């Protein structure tokens, strides 16, 4: 029976329990589900050519043996098979392949296979998100098959394109604009058409990357303030036209700009991706409803969601088997790639600790003990206020050696090296840090040291450096280009470091400063060195 039919035929309590009942599980019950599904997955995966290749002849009999035999994996371990879409090597037949960016400057894309069972689980869990997204308390929801949703997503083959597919098969929610039309439109056109349709039909849901929904929300406010389409709207929906007129009058009286909440009353608002914490307060102010955060990705599918209180994430028990690398273990591994970090299970996490997530995709998935590249913090082990007995998590960011801005970029040391090389600029050293401005918006801060000869012979200003490096970031990383095209921002800030500063730092310390996201304390120390009198030898010459 489809989700839509269940909403009509069953009691609200039955529907809630079927989709959101995982929130009533005890920790032991959650672990039992995890273990049962993982044992099934191990048996399936171990028999596949892909599994045999990674296991190297070993045959694990249980989860403990599996964790001891199978090393932590990355996409490099699967690339040769998955990029060629060799279905015959997989644990189960994929019915769909999802695509995303791998690493700018080195690998263009990575793909992930989805089995029918994985898609069934995905559909069930996004329906749970739909119920939770409209809820204000346990068991309460407002989802209807006649609802509308503003289309703010990337289409297939990207992971967000699965949402319209899932809803199409489960519930007749109307996308604005319709998916078949939206996929052919530019981002700007899609916003304008969706907004015009929303004015006449109303908007019940909004879902997208936090950064994108913020940009779209600002655009809606500006479009609402304009007069375009007023006559058409008056003919189609006189009541909605009157509501807009009254809203504009109210805003003029209060001396403020028109906001989406003045026109629309959302039932549910969901955001995904990174940096959502930077936008949620502003989005709540714009729409009058706090966004509910979920986490979904190309490899892991939809794995966790907030609840009616919008104050922490809970993992679904049936999407992946979860392991967690403690942050100190992760740091040891980043410093020494030969070091094998230990993992803990979900019933072993500690309150207040931060972890790198490791997943094994259930239901015939390809990825096992896979490092997704995302960081979580355990807020608490149980939520007494909501009577939830499961660990509650906060999404932090990507792992420290990757800089993600607004859910778009995957900037690494390799991609920056490529940019520097292609630019031809005489940059001898750099560090890159994800920082936040006074509005809590993320940006990429590059601290660069120029060749002293170049500084003498070339009139290189910070602005010229920024412009040239931006050009090559857009060339190396398509997602970086989308930041400008979709969000209208160029997140690059440049600080020029005096020649010899890095060498002086290394001379007086037992280590080199990390190139990607070094500690703020070390950056401040580097900047302090510039104000000191020092001499350092570079290329056989002394500089001071």
What positions do the PLM features span?
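Short amphipathic alpha-helical face segments that pack within enzyme cores
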Residues: 121-128, 215, 415
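Conserved AMP-binding loop of ANL adenylate-forming enzymes
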Residues: 132-173, 181-183
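Active-site glycine/GP-rich loop and adjacent strand/helix microenvironment
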Residues: 1-51, 81, 165-544
């Amino acid at each position: 029976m489809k989700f839509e039919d269940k909403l009509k035929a069953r009691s609200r309590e039955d529907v809630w329990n079927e989709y959101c009942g995982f929130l009533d599980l005890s920790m032991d019950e959650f672990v039992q589900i995890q273990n049962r599904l993982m044992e099934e997955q191990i048996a399936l995966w171990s028999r596949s050519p892909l599994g045999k290749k990674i296991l190297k002849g070993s045959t694990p009999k249980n989860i403990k043996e599996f964790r001891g035999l199978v090393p932590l994996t990355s996409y490099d371990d699967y690339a040769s098979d998955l990029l060629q879409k060799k279905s015959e090597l997989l644990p189960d037949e994929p019915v769909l392949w999802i695509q995303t960016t791998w690493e700018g400057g080195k690998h263009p894309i990575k793909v992930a296979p989805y089995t029918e069972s994985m898609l069934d689980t995905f559909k069930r869990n996004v329906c749970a998100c739909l119920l939770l997204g409209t809820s204000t308390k346990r068991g309460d929801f407002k989802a209807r098959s006649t609802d509308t949703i503003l289309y703010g997503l990337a289409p297939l083959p990207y992971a967000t394109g699965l949402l319209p597919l899932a809803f199409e098969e489960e519930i007749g929610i109307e996308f604005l604009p319709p998916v078949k039309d939206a996929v052919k439109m530019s981002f700007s056109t899609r916003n304008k058409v969706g907004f015009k349709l929303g004015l006449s039909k109303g908007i019940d849901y909004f879902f997208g990357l936090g950064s994108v929904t913020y940009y779209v929300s600002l655009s809606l406010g500006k479009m609402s303030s304009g007069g375009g389409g007023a006559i058409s709207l008056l003919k189609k929906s006189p009541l909605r036209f009157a509501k807009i007129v009254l809203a504009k009058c109210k805003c003029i009286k209060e001396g403020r700009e028109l906001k989406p909440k003045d026109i629309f009353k959302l039932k549910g608002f969901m955001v995904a991706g990174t940096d959502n914490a930077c936008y949620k307060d502003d989005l709540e102010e714009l729409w009058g409803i706090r966004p509910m955060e979920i986490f979904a990705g190309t490899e892991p599918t939809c794995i966790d969601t907030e609840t009616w209180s919008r104050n922490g994430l809970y993992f679904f028990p049936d999407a992946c088997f979860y392991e967690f690398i403690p942050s100190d273990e992760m740091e040891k591994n980043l410093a020494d790639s030969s070091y094998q970090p230990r993992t803990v299970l979900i019933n072993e996490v500690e309150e207040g600790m931060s972890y790198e997530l490791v997943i094994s995709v259930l239901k015939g998935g390809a990825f096992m003990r896979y490092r997704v590249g995302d960081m979580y913090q355990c807020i608490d082990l149980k939520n007494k206020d909501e009577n939830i007995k499961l660990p509650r998590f906060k999404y932090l960011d990507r792992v420290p050696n990757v800089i993600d801005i607004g859910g778009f970029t995957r900037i690494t040391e390799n991609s920056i090296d490529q940019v520097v090389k292609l630019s031809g600029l005489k940059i001898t050293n750099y560090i890159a840090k994800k920082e936040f401005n006074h509005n809590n918006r993320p940006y990429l801060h590059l601290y660069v040291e120029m060749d002293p000869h170049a500084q003498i012979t070339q009139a290189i200003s910070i602005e010229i450096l920024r412009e040239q490096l931006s050009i090559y970031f857009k060339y190396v990383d398509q997602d970086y280009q989308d930041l400008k095209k979709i969000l209208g921002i160029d997140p690059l800030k440049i600080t020029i470091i005096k020649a010899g500063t890095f060498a002086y730092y290394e001379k007086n310390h037992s280590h080199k400063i990390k190139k990607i996201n070094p500690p703020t304390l070390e950056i401040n120390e580097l900047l302090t060195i510039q104000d000191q009198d020092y001499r350092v030898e570079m290329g056989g010459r002394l500089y001071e």
